């Protein structure tokens, strides 16, 4: 159950994730923020669920995207040291978040367990091959 705090007088919003109404579930012109997350009480439930039906931003046109990538690459190659440090830190943080996400989600944990089983199986096959060759 999500407990929401309304900024005014509790009109237009319900309590609970499946009982929200009045634009609280989706962004709109009348409700510019995702109300369920924005006005959640600090002592309310906090899930790690991903929001469904979230609108993506408009995709960049290929020319702009190519210019952006070229600029980042240029800074990474011969930009000022501070800018290079920022880019390197961003890469490390992104890699950390990727590794962490695998541990947090059930699907990620299952994927890691499957990968570990595959590696063990490969190691056993290699061991058998070496034993038969001798």
Curated annotation (Swiss-Prot):
Further remark: All late proteins expressed from the major late promoter are produced by alternative splicing and alternative polyadenylation of the same gene giving rise to non-overlapping ORFs. A leader sequence is present in the N-terminus of all these mRNAs and is recognized by the viral shutoff protein to provide expression although conventional translation via ribosome scanning from the cap has been shut off in the host cell.
Q: What does this protein do?
A: Plays a role in the inhibition of host immune response within the nucleus. Interacts with cellular nucleosomes and immobilizes the host immune danger signal HMGB1 on chromatin. In turn, prevents HMGB1 release out of the cell and thus decreases inflammation. Also plays a role in the wrapping and condensation of the viral DNA. May also promote viral genome import into the nucleus.
Species, as recorded = Canine adenovirus serotype 2 (strain Toronto A 26-61) (CAdV-2)
This entry's comment on induction and repression of expression is: Expressed in the late phase of the viral replicative cycle.
Identify the keywords attached in UniProt to this record, alphabetized: DNA-binding, Host nucleus, Host-virus interaction, Late protein, Phosphoprotein, Viral penetration into host nucleus, Virion, Virus entry into host cell
- Give GO cellular component annotations, separated by semicolons: host cell; host cell nucleolus; viral capsid
Position of sequence motif Nuclear localization signal? 125-134
Site described as Cleavage, located at: 23-24
Entry's family note = Belongs to the adenoviridae histone-like nucleoprotein family.
Q: What is the protein name given in its UniProt record?
A: Pre-histone-like nucleoprotein
């Amino acid at each position: 159950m999500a407990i929401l705090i309304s900024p005014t007088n509790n009109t237009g919003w319900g309590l609970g994730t499946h009982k929200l109404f009045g634009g609280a579930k989706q962004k709109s012109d009348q409700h510019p923020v995702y109300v369920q997350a924005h006005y959640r009480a600090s002592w309310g439930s906090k899930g790690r669920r991903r929001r469904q039906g979230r609108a993506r931003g408009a995709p960049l046109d290929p020319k702009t995207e190519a210019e952006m990538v070229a600029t980042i690459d240029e800074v990474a190659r011969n930009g000022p040291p501070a800018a290079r440090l920022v880019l390197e830190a961003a890469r490390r943080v992104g890699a950390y978040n990727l590794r962490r996400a695998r541990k947090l989600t059930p699907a990620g944990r299952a994927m890691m367990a499957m990968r570990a089983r595959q590696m063990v199986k490969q190691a056993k096959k290699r061991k058998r091959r070496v034993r038969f060759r001798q």
